[in-house]
C-alpha cells in the first residue's frame, strides 16, 4: 500500500532489514521539505527580515507538530538536538551532580552507558540492573532494593535495540513519580512506533531521534523536558535573544539550543512526522507486528537458528536478533548482503551489557529489523536465504 517510493538497486530488488539503524526508504516529502528550506529560509531567530522570519516559522511549526505528536504540554517543551545520543548526554549531564545516585539497566545503548561512566568518574553513583537471558529486566523485584536516599533519577531505554523487547514503562514511571525521581526515557527505537501522551505521563525527559521511526533525515533529533524540570545545557552561546547577558537564556527551548539549528533537518523531520500521522501509528504498529511475528515463527523452524528476546507479547519493537550455528554474526550479515542483497546489522549493536546478558558477547547477533514498508515477500526471500546459510559449514564463510 505504501510502496510507491521503494528503491531498486543495480536492477535487483534490495531488501533492507536494518530499520532499527535508520528507516529506509524515506518519504519523498522529507527530501522535498529539506530542499525547499535550503532555498527559502535564512537563520531562525537571527533577524527581522523575511528570510529569517520564514526560518523561525519552520522551526516553530516543527516544534509544535512534535509537541502535538508526543502529547506534550506545549511546544516549548521540545528542544532540537542532533540525535538521541546528544539528547541523552544532555539529559544525564544536565540533571546529575556528584553525590547523586542514578539507576539504569543492562539493556542500555552506549549512548546511556558511556555518559554514565564519565559521570561516575566525577562522583555520580551508578547502579546497573541486570537483564535476564531472555533480555528482560524484573523491575518490581530489583528497583525497590536499589533505591538509596540520594537516588535522583532512573534512565532506561523503552525498547532494546538488540532484541526489540519493551520494558514495563508504566511500572518504572509510577515508581519514579511516587518517590520524586526524575524519569529519563530513551525513545530512540519507539518514537514513531509507540503512542506517547507526555502531559499525562510520568516521563520527565524523553530523548528521541528523527531518522528512525519518525522517518526524518539523519542528524536531527530532540529532547522533551517536562515543565518544572531543569536541565543544564551542554553548550552555550548564540541564542538570538538576551544578547547582552553574560549568561545563556534559561527558558526552554533556547536554554538547550545554543547555535544555529539544523533547519533543513528540522523541516525534513516535520515531513516525516506528517507521514507517520497520515499512515497512522496504530496501522504502522500492527503491520510491523504482523511481519515480526511471521518472521519469528518461520525463522525458529530453521535448523541451527537461535533467536534472542521475549516474543510472548506483541508489546515489542519490530526486531528479531538471532545467530546461526553459533557462527560469527558479521560473516552471516556479509553473506546476506553480498549474495542476496539483504541488508542487516551484526555485531554488538552498541549495547555491550545486553550481549553479556544474552551470552552473545563473542559472536554478536544478526539483527533483522522491519518497518511497515517491508513486505511478506521480502521476508520469505530472506527466510530462504537463511535456510541456505544454515545448510553450510563454517569453512564456507572463510
Listing of model-derived features with the role each one plays in the protein:
Residues 1-398:
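Pyridoxal 5′-phosphate
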Amino acid at each position: 500500500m505504501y510502496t510507491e517510493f521503494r528503491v531498486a538497486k543495480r536492477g535487483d530488488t534490495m531488501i533492507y532489514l536494518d530499520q532499527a539503524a535508520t528507516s529506509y526508504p524515506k518519504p519523498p516529502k522529507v527530501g522535498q521539505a529539506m530542499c525547499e528550506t535550503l532555498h527559502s529560509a535564512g537563520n531562525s531567530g537571527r533577524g527581522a527580515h523575511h528570510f529569517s522570519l520564514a526560518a523561525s516559522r519552520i522551526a516553530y511549526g516543527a516544534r509544535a507538530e512534535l509537541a502535538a505528536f508526543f502529547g506534550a504540554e506545549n511546544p516549548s517543551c521540545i528542544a532540537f538536538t542532533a540525535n538521541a545520543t546528544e539528547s541523552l548526554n544532555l539529559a544525564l549531564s544536565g540533571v546529575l551532580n556528584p553525590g547523586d545516585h542514578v539507576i539504569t539497566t543492562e539493556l542500555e545503548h552506549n549512548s546511556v552507558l558511556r555518559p554514565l561512566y564519565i559521570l561516575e568518574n566525577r562522583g555520580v553513583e551508578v547502579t546497573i540492573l541486570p537483564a535476564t537471558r531472555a533480555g528482560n529486566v524484573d523491575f518490581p523485584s530489583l528497583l525497590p532494593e536499589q533505591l538509596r536516599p540520594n537516588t535522583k533519577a532512573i534512565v532506561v531505554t523503552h525498547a532494546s535495540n538488540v532484541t526489540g523487547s519493551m520494558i514495563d514503562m508504566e511500572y518504572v514511571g509510577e515508581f519514579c513519580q511516587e518517590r520524586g525521581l526524575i524519569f529519563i526515557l530513551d525513545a530512540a527505537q519507539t518514537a514513531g512506533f509507540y503512542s506517547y501522551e507526555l502531559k499525562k505521563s510520568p516521563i520527565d525527559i524523553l530523548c528521541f531521534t528523527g531518522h528512525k521511526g519518525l522517518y526524518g533525515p539523519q542528524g536531527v533529533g530532540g529532547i522533551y523536558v517536562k515543565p518544572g524540570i531543569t536541565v543544564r545545557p551542554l553548550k552555550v552561546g548564540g541564542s538570538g535573544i538576551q544578547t547582552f547577558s553574560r549568561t545563556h537564556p534559561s527558558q526552554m527551548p533556547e536554554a538547550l539550543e545554543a547555535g544555529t539549528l539544523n533547519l533543513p533537518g528540522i523541516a525534513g523531520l516535520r515531513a516525516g512526522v506528517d507521514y507517520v500521522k497520515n499512515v497512522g501509528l496504530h496501522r504502522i504498529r500492527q503491520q510491523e507486528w504482523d511481519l515480526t511475528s511471521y518472521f519469528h515463527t518461520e525463522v525458529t523452524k530453521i535448523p541451527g537458528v537461535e533467536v534472542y528476546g521475549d516474543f510472548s507479547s506483541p508489546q515489542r519493537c519490530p526486531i528479531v536478533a538471532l545467530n546461526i550455528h553459533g557462527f560469527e554474526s558479521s560473516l552471516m550479515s556479509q553473506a546476506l548482503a553480498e549474495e542476496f542483497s539483504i541488508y542487516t546489522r551484526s555485531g554488538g549493536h552498541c549495547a555491550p551489557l545486553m550481549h553479556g546478558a544474552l551470552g552473545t558477547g563473542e559472536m554478536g547477533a544478526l539483527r533483522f529489523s522491519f518497518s511497515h514498508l517491508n513486505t511478506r515477500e521480502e521476508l520469505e526471500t530472506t527466510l530462504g536465504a537463511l535456510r541456505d546459510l544454515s545448510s553450510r559449514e563454517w569453512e564456507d564463510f572463510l
